[in-house]
A protein has these predicted regions:
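ATP-dependent carboxylate-amine ligase
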Residues: 2-179
Length: 179
């Protein structure tokens, strides 16, 4: 963007300052802080689409996120769709990437993600469900202050409504409410 601004003769200092206010679209990396009883969490919404490369990039992003002393990195993952015969290997193969990125808890939705969930060490398994809608309650119950929660999956895996449920649940709670 800055290269295009420079080519158009725009002042780069002003252009870079303006870029600081651009927010990622919903489902494509939007970050927001939500209130929980113990403080706040950071929600990273990557719910619009997923393929092996974008899933690894999102896990790298989660792994690079700084968490507080009490916070955890939580990945809530839905199926990557339309992968054909390689689907099982591509889903279960994410386990190494998850461990390398110090993800503390993984929730998984969908029949393809079951292969990943089964490949994970027991200590980081949150819950698996056949549908994302069945993870709403377990994810909400697991979250506490300081956590960074990333939600990612193919659009067809319906992770967007889970993001909306998290937003609605935690925005509706006053910061001082009991947990």
């Amino acid at each position: 963007m800055l290269l295009a601004a420079h080519a158009a003769g725009v002042d780069l200092e002003r252009a870079s300052a303006a870029l600081a206010y651009i927010e990622a679209p919903a489902g494509r990396g939007r970050r927001e802080n939500l209130r929980v009883a113990e403080g706040q969490i950071t929600l990273i919404d990557e719910s619009y689409n997923a393929n092996p490369a974008s899933m690894q990039a999102a896990l790298d992003l989660l792994g690079s996120a700084r968490v507080s002393d009490v916070g955890r990195r939580i990945a809530v993952l839905g199926d990557m769709l339309e992968l054909g015969a390689q689907s099982i290997a591509l889903h279960s193969g994410l386990a190494d990437h998850i461990e390398r990125n110090s993800v503390d808890v993984v929730f998984a939705a969908g029949n393809h993600m079951r292969h990943l969930f089964d490949a994970l060490p027991e200590r980081i398994r949150g819950a698996w469900a056949p549908r994302a809608s069945e993870l709403h309650a377990p994810v909400i119950e697991a979250i506490h202050g300081g956590d960074i929660v990333m939600v990612k999956g193919s659009n067809g895996s319906r992770m967007g409504p889970l993001v909306a449920a998290l937003r609605d649940h935690f925005r509706a709670r006053p910061a001082s409410a009991e947990g």
